[in-house]
């Protein structure tokens, strides 16, 4: 199960390196990013794999082809988003390739503070989905 984290990190890097057109992030987009991320965290907390999986972009679903496999990966490699003590939305930015990212400050189940960097991807139907998530521990900051 430990292979999931490197796979997810590689997926994140692959997504960043893909040629993507720059998005313009408006207030409605920011609100939608936060709704999606909060919805997925709520689904994780309820152990509702199908609901959590619905927020994932196709690139994630291609690597983790079922809600059960996806949830196993999240439980093993991303306890901070699977069972956060708390979370707050931080800045919404564009990554170097112009893709929108939503930063989330998380207090993990271990009491440590993390930044979750969510890369968002607009689908052909106009809906936003989570294309990647990278967790970075904030050293020296504990809850």
Feature-to-residue mapping (PLM):
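Positively charged n-region of N-terminal signal peptides that target proteins for export
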Residues: 1-6
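Bacterial N-terminal signal peptides
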Residues: 7-17
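Short helix-capping and inter-helix turn/linker motifs at the boundaries of alpha-helical repeat units
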Residues: 28-32
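Sec/Tat signal peptide C-region and signal peptidase I cleavage site
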Residues: 18-22
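Exposed beta-sheet edge and beta->alpha loop/turn motif
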Residues: 91-143
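Short solvent-exposed beta->alpha transition segments
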Residues: 24, 34-35, 39, 49-99
């Amino acid at each position: 199960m430990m292979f999931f984290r490197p796979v997810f990190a590689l997926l994140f890097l692959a997504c960043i390196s893909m040629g993507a057109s720059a998005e313009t992030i408006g207030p409605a987009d920011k609100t939608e990013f936060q709704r999606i991320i909060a919805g997925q965290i709520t689904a994780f907390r309820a152990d509702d794999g199908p609901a959590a999986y619905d927020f994932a972009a196709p690139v994630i679903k291609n690597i983790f082809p079922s809600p059960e496999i996806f949830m196993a990966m999240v439980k093993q490699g991303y306890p901070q988003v699977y069972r956060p003590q708390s979370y707050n939305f931080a800045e919404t930015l564009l990554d170097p390739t112009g893709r929108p990212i939503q930063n989330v400050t998380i207090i993990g189940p271990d009491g440590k503070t993390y930044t979750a960097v969510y890369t968002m991807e607009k689908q052909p139907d106009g809906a936003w989905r989570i294309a990647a998530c990278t967790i970075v521990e904030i050293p020296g900051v504990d809850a």
